[in-house]
């Protein structure tokens, strides 16, 4: 996401209550394309993994991102993922975030359940 990293009327890139579906899709597509352009203009390949701001995702966002060529998405739920040969298992993956100020050792102990 380029500009959907704040709480306010919208939580991350979730569709607002009562928001027109077409308007929402346009907003998410344009925001995502802005990021893609910035990255490719820097000579880097376009990302194929989308990381949801605040982990806030929906069926609408998953459908749109798949149509844009994304091969996986990451939420914020801290969990271990099971990856299979089914490409759909790569969507709404969990992840572990290491907060600023936490040592790598402490972080890994927590992530591995040794805390």
Report residues per predicted region.
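Active-site-adjacent pocket scaffolds in enzyme catalytic domains
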Residues: 1-12, 16-17, 62-115
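Metal-dependent polysaccharide deacetylase catalytic core of the NodB/CE4 family, i.e.
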Residues: 1-58, 92-93
